[in-house]
């Protein structure tokens, strides 16, 4: 056990900070209060120091780029196919990248690492600690979400390759087509009908069953389309970056979706 004594504690459950103690066991907070004691605990005196909860950065590309960079599009998205749900971004994450050191030194203790936004269906994300050297040991949970993208990023990527989609409506069509086909595949399985195994549709099943959320890169140009499309399948979803969301407040509230703005970690060494 670890006992942190005499810090100015800023707990999430209290209205005001107080001078007190935090007792940890097996890497988790066991008790917060004043005058705590534990005979077998390592004790550290934090008199004059502040003790705050770690910051969670829920949308990050940290460690997906080279040489300490957060990421570049070519590193954090596989662009061979605009529909790439089977891509798992944990295989691209490098915890020796300088971003992780910068994060922990500045109080960011947990990251939601997502694929980039060059595809329409980009892949799955994971949650990780920011300290360690083996990303699989650092990982808190795999497959926390499916990353989707609308707008200029997939449009521009595949337009430059003379591939579909090369328009905003083409991007939305591919998104709709994917979930329609994945739902038909899932429904057949649920009815006990024989289906040929399809990994791309298998990845969509926990999304369609609301077990994990879809997280859609989207700005004001495509926000109404994103809400309409994902609400049609009753998905849990968040709009990522969400520039111009003030234009769609009523639609956002009615859909029950979440909003995530910018990542906390966008630095290069």
Regions found by a protein language model. Name each.
Residues 1-40, 47-51:
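N-terminal metal-binding scaffold of metallo-dependent hydrolase/deaminase domains
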Residues 244-252:
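Active-site-adjacent beta->alpha loops and helix N-cap segments on the catalytic face
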Residues 12, 61, 114, 217-219, ...:
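Generic beta-strand/beta-sheet core signal
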Residues 56-58, 111, 146, 214-216, ...:
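Hydrophobic faces of well-ordered beta-strands that scaffold small-molecule active sites
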Residues 265-269:
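Conserved small/polar residues in nucleotide/adenosyl-binding loops
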Residues 230-237, 253-260:
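Glycine-enriched alpha-helix->loop->beta-strand junction motifs that scaffold or abut catalytic
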Residues 127-228, 233:
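Metal-coordinating catalytic core of metallo-dependent amide/deamination hydrolases
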Residues 49-115:
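Metal-associated gating/positioning segment near the N- to mid-region
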């Amino acid at each position: 056990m670890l006992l942190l004594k005499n810090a100015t504690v800023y707990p999430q459950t209290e209205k005001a900070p107080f001078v007190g103690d935090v007792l940890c066991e097996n890497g988790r907070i066991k008790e917060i209060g004043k005058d705590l004691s534990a005979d077998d605990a390592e004790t550290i005196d934090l008199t004059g120091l502040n003790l705050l909860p770690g910051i969670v950065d829920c949308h990050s590309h940290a460690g997906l780029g080279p040489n300490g960079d957060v990421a570049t599009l070519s590193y954090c998205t596989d662009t061979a196919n605009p529909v790439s749900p089977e891509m798992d971004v944990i295989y691209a994450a490098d915890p020796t990248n300088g971003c992780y050191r910068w994060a922990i030194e500045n109080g960011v203790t947990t990251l939601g690492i997502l694929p980039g936004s060059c595809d329409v269906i980009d892949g799955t994300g994971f949650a990780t600690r920011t300290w360690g050297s083996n990303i699989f040991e650092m990982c808190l949970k795999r497959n926390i979400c499916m990353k989707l993208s609308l707008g200029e990023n997939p449009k521009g990527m595949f337009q430059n390759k003379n591939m579909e989609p090369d328009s905003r409506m083409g991007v939305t069509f591919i998104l709709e087509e994917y979930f329609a086909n994945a739902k038909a595949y899932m429904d057949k399985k649920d009815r006990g009908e024989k289906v040929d195994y399809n990994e791309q549709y298998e990845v969509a099943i926990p999304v369609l069953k609301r077990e994990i959320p879809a997280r859609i890169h989207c700005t004001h140009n495509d926000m109404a389309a994103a809400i309409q499309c994902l609400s049609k399948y009753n998905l849990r979803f968040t709009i990522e970056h969400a520039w111009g969301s003030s234009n769609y407040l009523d639609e956002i509230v009615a859909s029950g979706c979440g909003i995530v703005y910018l990542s906390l970690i966008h630095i290069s060494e």
